[in-house]
Design a protein with these regions (language model features):
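Divalent metal-coordination and catalytic microenvironments
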Residues: 156, 205, 259, 299, ...
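Metzincin-family zinc-dependent endopeptidase catalytic domain
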Residues: 126-140, 148-149, 159-268, 376, ...
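Acidic, Ser/Thr-rich intrinsically disordered and amphipathic helical segments
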Residues: 5, 68, 199-203, 254, ...
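Sec-dependent signal peptide recognition
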Residues: 1-7
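Disordered inhibitory propeptide/activation segment of secreted metzincin zinc metalloprotease zymogens
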Residues: 2, 13-161, 270-273
Length: 469
């Protein structure tokens, strides 16, 4: 079977039409090195088009899933996304405008022959009911796993004599990368519109070995892909891994991952949802440009960094944190937590607030000027209540004019979610006004953030009516 799929990838020519147009977009000295892998990716694109009915069947919802989706859509807040001057949009939007997104795997990846071959095998097995014992990845972790790791680190400064294996950041059309180390100098493109930290982090995530979060084999337990809302020709961008090839290091599904596309990605029209989270309060969190705690934790697991800290000599981290591999006496903490052991409010602006039985106001303003900035400003608040009580947090006035997938320009993160290692619920749309969240404990971290103009958020909070037993 493996040889059969490899032949399929190699016999398809790329001598005309869209394939030639895309290859012609790649310029300069990197063209020769990219040619082979780009051909493989473009051939995969063509095969996926031929597999159209199979891909559509993969995305078809069972009656139970369809019923559940209808119930969720009745309750969800339909967000009208803002058009913001100076914002180039999400990666899939940037690459669509650049004319390359449809042809790259899942919109921004160039694949090796082995990776492309396994994707076709996944589709065959998913649609035929077969299964094979293949090596797992999530982070891409195939039989050549050790060769895909950057064992000596990544050379990210301009020193061409340091190592033969290195990343070369180029300004070609679109935002794209290889997945994992391919040997020698490999390119990562940050073209027009991609010059943002969050986009760069996403593409570096691919280069270091990560696929997209929404392609996890278990994604259907966390999001519903709405096939009818996906634009023509883009269904194959929503294929997923299989249990035989997908390894997630024991981490749960991360809605706030920088490797997750937005809930409106590849939609037929701007405000149609293509990915509906099972927890509807995560709708605006999908598509983040902020590196999540789980992203950091998983990358450290992938590269074995945590082994540097021996448990008996390392910090005893609280709230799900883990010892920093470069300073084992301190912890890397989930969002909303700080200090050496993750048991303090992060330093800087914000405050500790005490909830009572009456509604109290939290108003926060961040930012300056009118332009989009590279770096975020953050403020961290802790809302506390007595032991065994819960906290209610109401959004009174959300930020104005910044409603985009992932709330990647400004917003508020409210951590009423049960697992505090995961990203909290993020909000940035006017439709969020009036929404009330209830915590699972007597502490709610609230993180406000901004990197465009000035935004204000107003919340109210009080002790909830229910008590934790």
């Amino acid at each position: 079977m493996r040889i059969f799929f490899l032949c399929l990838l190699l016999v398809v020519g790329v001598d005309g039409g869209i394939f030639k147009d895309l290859i012609d977009k790649i310029k300069g000295s990197i063209k020769t090195k990219l040619q082979k892998d780009l051909n493989v990716t473009l051939n995969l694109y063509k095969k996926l088009k031929e597999y159209g009915s199979k891909v559509k069947n993969m995305l078809k919802l069972t009656p139970k899933m369809l019923k559940s989706l209808k119930e969720k859509l009745k309750k969800v807040r339909l967000i009208v996304r803002d058009k913001i001057a100076g914002d180039d949009g999400s990666i899939d939007e940037i690459n669509e405008k650049s004319g390359v997104g449809e042809y790259l795997y899942q919109g921004d990846m160039i694949l090796s022959e082995k990776q492309a071959e396994e994707i076709l095998e996944n589709i065959e097995e998913e649609t035929s009911g077969g299964a094979r014992n293949r090596t797992k990845r999530q982070a891409f972790k195939d039989s050549s796993y050790s060769r895909k790791l950057w064992s000596q680190g990544v050379t990210y400064f301009f020193d061409y004599g340091t190592t033969n294996d290195r990343l070369r950041v180029v300004a070609q059309d679109g935002c794209w990368s290889y997945v994992g180390k391919n040997g020698g100098e490999q390119s990562l493109s940050l073209g027009r519109g991609c010059e943002h930290v969050g986009v760069a982090v996403h593409e570096l995530g691919h280069a270091l070995g990560f696929f997209h979060t929404m392609s996890r084999y278990d994604r259907d337990a966390y999001i519903t892909v709405i096939e009818r809302n996906i634009k023509s020709g883009w269904r194959d961008q929503f294929t997923k891994e299989s249990p035989q090839t997908n390894y997630n290091y024991g981490f749960g599904y991360d809605y706030g991952s920088v490797m997750h596309y937005g809930s409106h990605s590849a939609a037929m029209s701007r405000n149609l949802i293509t990915m509906m989270p099972n927890d509807k309060n995560y709708l605006e969190t999908l598509g983040s440009h902020i590196l999540s705690f789980i992203d950091i934790f998983m990358m450290n697991e992938h590269y074995g960094c945590r082994k540097k800290c021996k448990p008996e000599f390392s910090a005893k981290c609280k709230n799900g944190g883990f010892p920093h591999p470069r300073n084992c006496s301190r912890c890397i903490c989930p969002s909303g937590y700080g200090g050496a052991l993750c048991n303090e409010r992060p330093h800087g602006c914000g405050a500790e607030l005490q909830a009572t039985s009456n509604w109290q106001k939290l108003q926060d303003t961040l930012g300056f000027g009118r332009e989009i900035r590279e770096d975020f400003e953050f403020c961290n608040y802790w809302i506390k209540s007595p032991d065994h009580s819960q906290i209610e947090v109401k959004i009174v006035n959300p930020p104005k004019g910044v409603a985009v997938d992932g709330c990647y320009l400004a917003g508020v993160e409210i951590k009423t979610n049960r697992d505090q290692t995961h990203t909290g619920y993020r909000f940035c749309a006017k439709e969020d006004a009036g929404l009330t969240l209830t915590s699972h404990s007597n502490l709610v971290p609230v993180v406000t953030y901004n990197r465009i103009a000035t935004t204000t958020v107003e919340l109210e909070y009080r002790i909830g009516e229910c008590r934790i037993l």
